[in-house]
Amino acid sequence: MELTADRAEEILAAFAERRVLVVGDMTVDEHRIGSATRISREAPVPVIEQSGHMFLPGGAANLAFNIRALGADVSVAGLVGDDNMAGRLRAMLDSAGVHTAGLIAEPARPTSVKLRVWAGGDRQHQYQQVARIDMVNRDPVSEVSQQELILYLEGAVPEYDGVLISDYENGVVDEPVLEALLPLAARHGKFVGADSHGQLHRFRGVEALTPNQPEAEAELGRSLHEPVELLDGGAELLRELDCRRLLITLGAMGMAVFDNEGEARAIPARPVAGVADTTGAGDTVAGVFTLSLLAGATSAEAAAIANLAGAIVVTKLGAATTSPDEILARLVEDASAAE
């Protein structure tokens, strides 16, 4: 069944009534932008003359940023350092209206930063990412910080409609935190979704999972490239992970959605006029899918809205966001073009 504009508007309007707690690995995304003017004499690499420099929330912070831009009330819970980048991240989130009381400072653990360098020649209208440098600490989290985070979660989880876990495998969403969080959410009847970059089995039993194709393939141990492989593999993964809903993102091929009520379908990607950057697109999809489900959408409806959102943000540079108005406008535009 096609998603109508009226139904989409009903779902999107309900976003503003939802409260979501995002738990996971917080990072700062740093972007340096310039023109590639020549090849260096020191090595066969381009020389970039910088013309722009910006910072954006990354990782779980970007997921929260997206959810806030969609109109929902959102808080973050995770670890940062006791440094300038932590202050910058707090300021960005605070200015967007994201609640940051759950950010725990661990002085011995610098705030994670991911630096991307973008270059475009004088005649180029789009920039290309030419380098990425990750400054990420994956050391085990201290027991003191773990307990402080768990204590915060015990007080916060009952106050929210749902919890969305954003796991970049940087150490925050480790076993002690999961062993406290999942039963806590279950006791209070809270929705739990997870967007994990690996080891999907650690999130067995959650309401919704949103892996990309390589992550799903790694969990299953086989390819999902052919349509029959995708549909069979997705259904198997749904059963193995004992979750109610599974959304597998497929990059330029779109996505596939499965649920325990028999839904199993591939959704083609929306047309995109020039991909600027895929950074954070998975966060947008996870946020929109989760909010749509919390707003009463079916799995297929939630996936269709998430598909629209993903097509919007990949046309923007950096870990971008979208809004309900922008999503609805894109749906109407696509419907008009199809007539």
Positions of predicted regions on the chain:
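Conserved post-catalytic alpha-helical subdomain immediately downstream of the catalytic base
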Residues: 240-244, 270-333
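Short coil-to-helix leader/linker segments, especially the first N-terminal amphipathic alpha-helix
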Residues: 1-14, 183
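Conserved phosphate/ATP/ADP-binding segment of small-molecule kinases
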Residues: 162, 170-264
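Structural beta-sheet core signal
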Residues: 22, 76-78, 194, 248
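Flexible glycine/proline-rich, aromatic-decorated loop/lid segments
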Residues: 38-43, 206-214, 253-282, 328-331, ...
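Conserved N-terminal subdomain of the carbohydrate kinase-like
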Residues: 5, 17-20, 28-164, 323-339
